[in-house]
A protein has these predicted regions:
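Surface loops and adjacent helix of pleckstrin homology
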Residues: 89, 234, 271
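Extracytoplasmic/secreted envelope proteins and their assembly/folding machinery
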Residues: 99, 146-150, 208-212, 265-266, ...
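Short, compositionally biased
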Residues: 99-108, 235-238, 364-375
């Protein structure tokens, strides 16, 4: 059963009639007073390794007589580096869709003949934007990669700050990586690690590069949704987020299947130069790639061989092979759907499409979500992928 039911959301959001946005900057709600208005919001949240971005457009802050912006009215909302939280919904019900910091401020005065009005545009990024802006070469205290990821994240003051209610501004949800012994404390906690000289190192890389490297090494995902930062096993939660059919607020839909680049197997290998020993592992695809029998023979003998000099065991080669096989398999199916605005739709989860007909009916893994809101409308656009033909 899916986590959310469209009928329940329709009732909760009062038939999706009156879009509502709440923007909180440094703990203070941006209020529509003195003419200042949030005229539009665009939020793009990604389940990939990229940073998520939000754009907030403010109007009602320009004096036509003096032809200047009333900075006194807006100053408290314009500080770059300020924390920002965006909630979207309808009527009296809203849900958080973005959390990050103000990275850029633009003042825009359009051509006087245009219908557009002068506005201030706030461009915001999630914390990944900060993790990209450094570079280190150092030996960490942690022995295992999940602990090392936690160590790096906890060193970031923006991540570790408290919100206006005294809670954590960012919650770290970190699964243990396979290099950590079973039975060790979860959540990336260091616990009581054995005394050993083995420690994880960062070499000429940013915090972001290091975490992405660790994610690819063990077939993990690294993304942020609202207040939660995830470093977790890829696609482990297969419970659908929501089931959608053509009668559930559909605006636009594009579904496609493409066998280009698919392979039957992935091989990851390396040579231990000291011992002259072969290290490697092989995985085979189990995906159903066609409704007929024409495509399978074309892929059957195709393989991807990847040389990984960092692999020092069959198990590690298997983790990298799983990451590569997962990446290839999920090239098969793609979806771009636009529905009535639903803040519950997030990346990193599966959405089930039903009653569209075969092969459109399928479980798609959401990779990107874009929420678009004006004072009159709210829509949610999502992109997703699938590793098998629709059923």
């Amino acid at each position: 059963m899916a986590d959310f039911n469209f009928g329940d959301l329709k009732k909760q959001y009062e038939m999706f009639r009156e879009p509502k946005v709440v923007v909180t900057i440094d703990g203070n709600d941006l209020k529509d007073d003195g003419g200042l208005t949030v005229s539009s919001v665009e939020v793009e949240v990604t389940g990939g390794y990229e940073a998520s971005i939000a754009t907030v457009t403010l109007t009602g802050c320009y004096d036509k007589d003096t032809r200047s912006f009333d900075i006194k009215k807006t100053k408290q909302y314009l500080y770059m580096g300020s924390s920002i939280i965006i909630y979207l919904g309808y009527g009296s019900a809203v849900r958080e869709v973005f959390r990050g910091f103000i990275a850029r401020v633009h003042f825009m005065i359009p051509n006087l003949s245009d219908e557009d009005v002068p506005s201030i545009e706030l461009t915001c990024m999630d914390v990944k934007g900060l993790l990209m802006a450094n570079r280190h070469s150092k030996r960490l205290k942690s022995q295992y990669y999940s602990d090392a990821v936690k160590e790096v994240l906890e060193a970031n003051s923006f991540i570790m700050q408290k919100d206006s209610k005294g809670g954590n501004f960012t919650e770290l949800i970190i699964n243990n990586t396979p290099d950590k012994p079973q039975g060790a404390p979860g959540g990336g906690g260091g616990g009581q690690q054995k005394t050993t000289d083995k420690r994880v190192e960062m070499v000429e890389e940013s915090d972001y590069d290091f975490i992405v490297k660790a994610a690819k090494k063990y077939n993990f995902e690294f993304f942020i949704v609202g207040s939660n930062l995830y470093f977790i096993e890829a696609k482990k939660n297969t419970t659908p987020l929501i089931e959608l059919n053509p009668m559930m607020g559909l605006i636009d839909l594009d579904i496609g299947y493409d066998m280009t680049g698919l392979v039957k197997s992935v091989v990851v290998r390396n040579i231990d130069m000291e011992q002259g020993k072969y290290i490697g592992n092989k995985l085979q695809s189990k995906s159903k790639i066609s409704m007929g029998n024409k495509a399978k023979p074309l892929v059957e003998n195709q393989s991807l061989v990847y040389i990984d000099p960092t692999t020092d065991s069959k198990e590690e080669a298997g983790y990298r092979a799983a990451y590569l096989m997962n990446s290839v398999d999920y090239r098969l199916g793609s979806v771009t759907g636009v529905f009535v605005g639903m803040p519950e739709i997030i990346p990193g989860r599966f959405v089930t499409l039903k009653d569209f007909g075969q092969p459109l009916n399928n479980d798609f893994y959401i990779t990107t979500v874009r929420h678009s809101m004006t004072r009159l409308s709210y829509s949610t656009r999502f992109e997703g992928v699938a590793n098998q033909i629709g059923k």
